[in-house]
Curated annotation (Swiss-Prot):
This is Imidazole glycerol phosphate synthase subunit HisH. One of its GO terms (biological process) is L-histidine biosynthetic process. PANTHER family: IMIDAZOLE GLYCEROL PHOSPHATE SYNTHASE SUBUNIT HISH. Heterodimer of HisH and HisF. It catalyses: 5-[(5-phospho-1-deoxy-D-ribulos-1-ylimino)methylamino]-1-(5-phospho-beta-D-ribosyl)imidazole-4-carboxamide + L-glutamine = D-erythro-1-(imidazol-4-yl)glycerol 3-phosphate + 5-amino-1-(5-phospho-beta-D-ribosyl)imidazole-4-carboxamide + L-glutamate + H(+); L-glutamine + H2O = L-glutamate + NH4(+).
Amino acid sequence: MIGVIDYGMGNLFSVSKALERVGVPYVVSDRPEELEKADAFILPGVGSFSDAMDNLRRAKLDQFIHRMVDEGKLLLGICLGMQLIFEESTENGSAKGLGLLAGKAVRLKDRDAEGNKLKVPHMGWNRLTFHQTSPLLSEAEEGFVYFVHSYYIDGMEDGDLLASAEYGVRVPAVVGKRNVFGAQFHPEKSGTAGMAILTQFTKMAAEQQVKK
C-alpha cells in the first residue's frame, strides 16, 4: 500500500487518481498512525516551501518521514515535495527542509545563457535526459514530462541526479539516493513517461515488501 502524505498543500486528487490507474491500494492521511501502515510514501506538494515545512512540523509529519526513511521505506517527493526532501530553500529568505538529500531550492532564472527571456514560473513540457541507471527509471524513456515550478534544486550531489531537463539551466528532474526519490515534474500529469515512473515506484515498494 502507498501512503500519500496530506499536509494541506498537496495535489492529492491527481495523485490519487494516478494510483487508481496503476491499480495499487493507497491511503491519503495527515495522521502518522494511519500512514505508517503503508509500504512506501508519496509526498506531493504545491505552494510555498516555508508554509509546507510549517505544516509538516505542526502535524509532526517531518519526524514521521524521517522515521519511515530510517526504517528503509521508500519515499517519493513530487514537485514541491521533491524540494522539501533537500536541505533548504531560498524562497522568502531561507527555510530549512527535511535534509534527506544535500542541496537547496533556488529561483529559476528569467534569462537563458543567450539573454533570451524565460517565463517564471516554468509551466510546460520538457524532455528528460537520463544521467544514471536506477530502478525508478528502468521502465521509462527520455520523453516529455510536465513541469509547474518557480524553483529548482542547486548544489546537489552529482551521484543523486538521475535525470534532468533544460530551462535556462539544468533542472534536476528526477533525484534519488538509497530509498529517497524525487520528481520535480508531475508524473501523474505527464502521460506515458510519467506513469511509467509512478508505476515503477509502486513495483519497487511491492518488491521491497516481499523481501521482508
